From Swiss-Prot:
InterPro entries: DNA_mismatch_repair_MutS, DNA_mismatch_repair_MutS-lik_N, DNA_mismatch_repair_MutS/MSH, DNA_mismatch_repair_MutS_C, DNA_mismatch_repair_MutS_clamp, DNA_mismatch_repair_MutS_core, DNA_mismatch_repair_MutS_N, DNA_mismatch_repair_MutS_sf. PANTHER family: DNA MISMATCH REPAIR PROTEIN MSH1, MITOCHONDRIAL (PTHR11361:SF34), DNA MISMATCH REPAIR PROTEIN MUTS FAMILY MEMBER (PTHR11361). It comes from Jannaschia sp. (strain CCS1). GO terms for molecular function: ATP binding; ATP-dependent DNA damage sensor activity; damaged DNA binding; mismatched DNA binding. One of its GO terms (cellular component) is cytosol. ATP binds at residues 630-637. Keywords: ATP-binding, DNA damage, DNA repair, DNA-binding, Nucleotide-binding. Belongs to the DNA mismatch repair MutS family. It comes from the Bacteria. This is DNA mismatch repair protein MutS. CDD domains: ABC_MutS1. This protein is involved in the repair of mismatches in DNA. It is possible that it carries out the mismatch recognition step. This protein has a weak ATPase activity. One of its GO terms (biological process) is mismatch repair.
Length: 877
């Protein structure tokens, strides 16, 4: 070691060497300091000053720091920028260090926690309404498994996951961090990173299934995992790696994880990554939660209810009984608005039980986590009392039963805690007066020392009969009893001398003490510290009582979330005039008056109504496909998306925006809409489209719903038409699924006469005086043109370009009608002049316009105005 290295810096270097992959927050008094490369990286990431402290190997030591009291905000910034942070705390005070090792002793420090994206628990570092998942992927002899947990709520699950399903499942969960074996191929690690998760490679030993089983059995205090499920080796391996990582990052203080729940992919509606993105389930394409389906659905009052909504929306059920039970619960609150309003008013006061419990388990909780548990359980009890006398559907009845069973803990917390505890335990004042006699005494001595002394003085005056007796204080004797020499004689002799102990005689005064006064003096001098120490002990006692009831608290949290979600979906259904879908085992798909929930909500803000449309894709024994044609901007993509969204909403457990809906269970939803490239992988927009289409054709089963928008548009016309044609035939003949297929290749409409399960539909438009009016109505039939030039005009292309485009279009269409070759037609077109073509002459005024110009509204009677309106209507038709 360099002889010039100070003991403190030697300690830092030793601790840093043990945590090379993390920024080290090294506690020094009221600050966390960072040194060397850590300081350079942190200063840049946090935009704070970079300074220096001493030298090492002849070079200045870079240094920066952040205040300990506001460290969480800096931690959040660093975590979001991809850093891992080691929290290195002082484990003793300087005075203790000096007693241990002399004046040059260094305060003992240890890393108490590694902060990573998937291991956050503090409210300030988390999104209250979203899970913060840590996931782990294991591959054992070609068998894959995915495990995930949220240590801030205790949620812990696992499922078998073939490599081909890893991307879609991670897209469903949106974990913040994914643990993988360091032998996992780089391409797959990059794919995980593209989903927005941090990838943390671990050694193969972390995934060893034998040691993993031992870790899990030890965590849950069982001899075997068979009571939790029949886990495959890969599942055990993935779960074990999670526990191993938590032991590493939490330094042995493991979170409260519920027993692992085995999840089956067959019981969830399958949605791949592209479909989730295209349908904007939880995040809009523009980024953020706003204008996503989740934002439109969410009327929950609690954080737990919001997380449950996201979990179900990202993983809708395919179990008919489960779906119907959820609909029945929503229907109850949809019908009984008084009970729902009363429930929601109570739910607004419910804190986040799960996260408060998790922080207490990890010893990161404070007084307000105790009060959060108290307030949450009190609210649960009030709701239970109100709802247990109501005739509820089975799912809600079970939720209400979950709210019970914690009366003793609730009574304890009600008695022990003040109404509004402090944020920090060190501030004191969390225990209610009257709960603990010794604490009350300490507080009284601390806050009312003078009055206690005065009371004691009055007692002594009465006991001695010496009215001149006083209790005084100085820095030498402390508290003492003083009286004149004249009266002292009485106190120096029995029986009073047995109680009053002589301490000092001065020229005119005699001073005494008593055992009671000496004890009181000690108590007064130490009362403040004693009160804090008693509260610390009581805090730990209450924390232990809460942790002993963790199962009941978790159960209550789940019951509250279920009630909240059912009521929230009912409120949203009432607001939007939504209907309960009829769910069936067959392949029915009949929706009348369907509306896009997100678009409708956006239009409503501007006072515009949404044009509803029907959809019938019912199929038994074969495919049911609608081929949709029509112009751009007419609403084809909206129509495709809305029907897919209604399926997802229905199988989530929500009502749907429609007049009525009958939906046979859907196993998969695939969406190929929109345009995007993947430049990082060298993929063009067309290549991305083809990859997504290939996924659909290879994976869609006969219970899938597929929506395809303009397949083949990114290449030459005949190439694109050929691909679209073959894709449609494959969906019909091989996949035999329900599908909506939008295209501008009008030639494909002829397939309806050849494919039994194919019908044509078009989005209606109206032409009026050279303008196109989009009616947004889906009707049977086929479009004969796409109105691309008119849409280009609406987009603001220069008039010269529009005029030239119309000339070219007319020539091409004429060539097709006359059977000429396209090249010959193009060769016959006049060259585009260098000067812009003259703007088209204004069209002559129509009869309607001429009549309107001649009208003077103020001079017309109501009858004349009505007659004129009928005349104008006749002219239009």
């Amino acid at each position: 070691m360099n002889a010039q290295v100070t003991p403190m810096m030697a300690q830092y270097l030793e601790i840093k060497a043990a945590h090379p992959d993390a920024l080290l927050f090294y506690r020094m008094g009221d600050f966390y300091e960072m040194f060397f490369d850590d300081a350079v990286a942190a200063a840049e990431a946090l935009d704070i000053a970079l300074t220096k402290r001493g030298k090492h190997n002849g070079e200045d030591i870079a240094m920066c720091g952040v205040p300990a009291h506001s460290a969480e905000s800096y931690l959040l910034t660093l975590i979001r920028k991809g850093f891992r942070v080691g929290i290195c705390e002082q484990m003793e005070d300087p005075a203790t260090a000096k007693k241990r090792g002399g004046s040059k002793a260094v305060v003992r420090r240890e890393v108490v926690r590694l902060v990573t994206p998937g291991t956050l628990t503090e409210d300030t570092l988390l999104e209250a309404r979203r899970h913060n998942y840590l996931a782990s992927y294991a591959d054992v002899r070609g068998e894959g498994a995915l495990a995930w947990c949220d240590i801030s709520t205790g949620d812990f699950r696992v499922m078998r996951c073939p490599a081909v399903r890893l991307g879609p499942e991670l897209a469903r969960l949106s974990p913040k961090e994914v643990l993988v074996s360091d032998g996992l191929d780089i391409a797959r690690q990059d794919a995980i990173i593209e989903l927005g998760a941090a990838v943390t490679p671990l050694s193969p030993g972390s995934f060893d299934s034998a040691s993993a089983e031992q870790r899990l059995a030890g965590l849950f205090s069982v001899s075997t995992l068979e009571g939790f499920g029949n886990f495959a080796r890969a599942e055990v391996s993935a779960m074990g790696a999670l526990i191993d990582y938590l032991e590493l990052t939490q330094k042995g203080a493991l979170p409260l994880l519920r027993a692992p729940r085995q999840q089956s992919a067959d019981r969830l509606l399958q949605l791949d990554t592209a479909t989730r993105r295209n349908l904007e389930l939880t995040q809009a394409l523009s980024g953020g939660r706003a204008n996503s389906l989740l934002s439109v659905l969410d009327r929950t009052q609690t954080a737990g209810g919001a997380r449950l909504l996201q979990r179900r929306l990202t993983g809708p059920s395919t179990d008919l009984d489960v779906i119907r039970a959820r609909h029945e619960s929503v229907s109850f609150f949809f019908s009984d608005t008084l009970i729902r309003d009363d429930l929601e008013a109570e739910l607004r006061r419910i804190p986040d039980l799960d996260r408060a419990l998790s922080r207490l388990a990890l010893d990161r909780g404070g007084p307000r986590d105790l009060s959060a548990i108290r307030d949450g359980l009190s609210g649960a009890a009030r709701l239970s009392d109100k709802l247990k006398i109501v005739d509820l559907p089975p799912l809600l009845e079970g939720a209400v039963q979950d709210l019970q069973g914690h009366d003793e803990l609730s009574a304890l917390l009600d008695e022990a805690l003040v109404a509004e505890p402090p944020v920090q335990l060190r501030d004191g004042g969390l225990i209610a007066p009257g709960y603990h006699a010794e604490l009350d005494e300490a507080r009284t001595l601390r806050d009312e020392g003078r009055s206690v002394i005065a009371t004691m003085q009055a007692d002594y005056v009465e006991a001695t009969g010496v009215n001149a007796l006083k209790i005084k204080h100085n820095n030498v004797l402390g508290y003492f009893i003083e009286t004149t020499a004249t009266h002292a004689e009485k106190m120096l002799n029995p029986p009073l001398s047995e109680r009053f102990i002589h301490r000092q005689t001065t020229a005119n005064q005699v001073r005494f003490t008593t055992v009671e006064l000496s004890e009181l003096e000690t108590k007064i001098l130490n009362a403040g510290n004693r009160a804090l120490e008693i509260e610390r002990v009581l805090f730990q006692s209450l924390r232990d009582a809460i942790l002993n009831c963790q199962d009941q608290i978790g159960q209550a949290a789940r019951g509250l979330a279920e009630l909240d979600l059912s009521a929230a979906l009912a409120r949203r259904a009432r607001e939007g005039d939504w209907t309960q879908p009829e769910m069936t085992e067959d392949r029915a798909f009949m929706i009348e008056g369907a509306r896009h929930p997100v678009v409708e909500a956006a239009l409503a803000k501007d006072g515009t109504s949404f044009v509803a449309n029907d959809c019938d894709l019912s199929a038994e024994g074969g495919a049911a496909i609608t081929l949709l044609t029509g112009p751009n901007m007419a609403g084809k993509s909206t129509y495709l998306r809305q029907n897919a969204l209604l399926v997802i909403m229905a199988q989530t457990g929500s009502f749907v925006p429609a007049k009525c809906a009958k939906i046979g269970l859907v196993s998969q939803v695939f969406s190929r809409v929109g345009a995007s490239d993947d430049l990082a992988r060298g993929r063009s927009t067309f290549m991305v489209e083809m990859v997504e289409t290939a996924t659909i054709l290879n994976q869609a089963d006969d219970r899938a719903l597929v929506i395809l928008d303009e397949i083949g548009r990114g290449t030459a016309t005949y190439d694109g038409l050929s691909i679209a044609w073959a894709t449609l035939e494959h969906l019909h003949e091989t996949n035999q699924c329900r599908a909506l297929f939008a295209t501008h290749y009008h030639e494909m409409t002829s397939l309806a006469s050849k494919l039994d399960g194919l019908t044509n539909a078009t989005v209606a438009v109206k032409e009026w005086e050279g303008e196109v009016i989009f009616l947004h109505e889906v009707r049977e039939g086929a479009a004969d043109r796409s109105y691309g030039v008119q849409v280009a005009k609406l987009a603001g292309l220069p008039d010269a370009v529009i005029a030239r485009a119309q000339v070219v279009l007319d020539a091409l269409e004429k060539g097709e009608r006359e059977g000429g070759e396209r090249k010959a037609v193009i060769d016959d077109l006049p060259l585009f002049a260098m000067m812009p073509a003259p703007a088209p002459a204004p069209s002559a005024p129509s009869l309607v316009e001429e009549k309107l110009r001649a009208v003077h509204p103020d001079e017309m009677t109501a009858r004349e105005a009505l007659n004129l309106l009928y005349e104008l209507k006749a002219e239009l038709s």
